[in-house]
Amino acid sequence: MGNITADNTSMNCDIDHTIHQTLAPVVYVMVLVVGFPANCLSLYYGYLQIKARNELGVYLCNLTVADLFYICSLPFWLQYVLQHDHWSHDDLSCQVCGILLYENIYISVGFLCCISIDRYLAVAHPFRFHQFRTLKAAMGVSALIWVKELLTSIYFLMHEEVVEDADRHRVCFEHYPLEPRQRGINYYRFLVGFLFPICLLLASYRGILRAVRRSHGTQKSRKDQIQRLVLSTVVIFLACFLPYHVLLLVRSLWESSCDFAKGIFNAYHFSLLLTSFNCVADPVLYCFVSETTHRDLARLRGACLAFLTCARTGRAREAYPLGAPEASGKSEDPEVLTRLHPAFQTPHPPGMGGSPAGGLS
């Protein structure tokens, strides 16, 4: 608890941080333990997709890199909450960790939106828009997303984000009640960083489901499987990001007193913790549902066991290499969403007979 001060002016906000300081370490440790290895494997899977000239791998690698940047900032935030919300490092490190914390949300939303649009074009328009489904196009879009968020982060570097409370604790990225300068950037975050991308994402997945329902060559069990995956993706996306952005908007519209700040503090910080779980959900949804990933992970495990056996016995032993997609053309492996087990298959144009194609090209 403490009176938050900013620019040497007391805000007189006595806010109880107990619930936040209890929940945050649990969430941060969980995301560190599960999210770091999961995202490292996700990065490997994205590399295989890029090696196979699949544009999906570009988005997946960028999404994973953003998650790993955020995960790397978690030890600092863990230390912060364990020290009762006291930032023991310099001001610049607070700004950098704050940028990694908050901008990761919008970088993730951007790349999740790109993945959904790419899958929509692959399923609903498999014979059109090839110019948008190339490595060059994916790298260009990815660069725009990073530049957009880097420019936004300059705003935070221009303002002081470390302030002292009445207990002489240096709090980082916490201003209660909300400062007037923060409202504009919060409206931008809500409208441009969240609302617009999620409308695109929902429209894309709706188009995917419509295209699959119209596909006569896809079995009902596979259609049901696709529907479950799409719905799971949307539900997890909304669960991770919607509560935070609703409360961010509420704070920006109505938080002008300490009483309001104290009333919304726990709910707001709980919603912020929910966004952390996206770092764990991303690799699970977009990589580990693939049969190919299961096979590669099994081979990786076999190679590791073989290596350990060699080291223990001192005898040379052959280890099977990891499987990788073909180096030329599109991957023959199941693609995320569109080749799930291999549930998503390219619809044939009207009048074209035979069973559906084995995958997207």
Curated annotation (Swiss-Prot):
Membrane topology, record value: Multi-pass membrane protein
Annotated region (Extracellular loop 2 (ECL2)), positions in chain: 161-176
GO biological process, one term: cellular response to pH
Modes of activity regulation: Activated by a network of residues that connects an extracellular-facing cavity to Glu-149, a conserved charged residue buried in the transmembrane core of the receptor. Protonation likely drives conformational changes in extracellular loop 2 (ECL2), which stabilizes movement of transmembrane 3 (TM3) and a series of rearrangements that connect the extracellular-facing cavity to Glu-149, a residue only conserved in proton-sensing G-protein coupled receptors.
Region annotation (Disordered) ranges: 340-361
Glycan-carrying positions: 3, 8
Transmembrane segments: 13-49, 54-84, 90-125, 134-160, 177-214, 219-254, 261-289
UniProt keyword Lyase present: no
Subcellular location: Cell membrane
Annotated site, Proton sensing, chain positions: 17, 20, 84, 169, 269
PROSITE patterns associated with the record: G_PROTEIN_RECEP_F1_1, G_PROTEIN_RECEP_F1_2
Keyword terms: Cell membrane, Disulfide bond, G-protein coupled receptor, Glycoprotein, Membrane, Receptor, Transducer, Transmembrane, Transmembrane helix, Tumor suppressor
Site (Required for activation) residue list: 149
Signal peptide (residue range): none
GO molecular function: G protein-coupled receptor activity
Keyword Transmembrane helix annotated: yes
Residue intervals annotated with topology Extracellular: 1-12, 85-89, 161-176, 255-260
Positions of disulphide bridges: 13-258, 94-172
Domain remark from Swiss-Prot or TrEMBL: A multitude of proton-sensing residues, which include extracellular histidine residues (His-17, His-20, His-84, His-169 and His-269) or triad of buried acidic residues (Asp-67, Glu-149 and Asp-282), contribute to activation of the G-protein coupled receptor activity and pH sensitivity.
Function, as annotated: Proton-sensing G-protein coupled receptor activated by extracellular pH, which is required to monitor pH changes and generate adaptive reactions. The receptor is almost silent at pH 7.8 but fully activated at pH 6.8. Ligand binding causes a conformation change that triggers signaling via guanine nucleotide-binding proteins (G proteins) and modulates the activity of downstream effectors, such as phospholipase C. GPR68 is mainly coupled to G(q) G proteins and mediates production of diacylglycerol (DAG) and inositol 1,4,5-trisphosphate (IP3).
Protein's UniProt name: G-protein coupled receptor 68
Organism, scientific name: Bos taurus
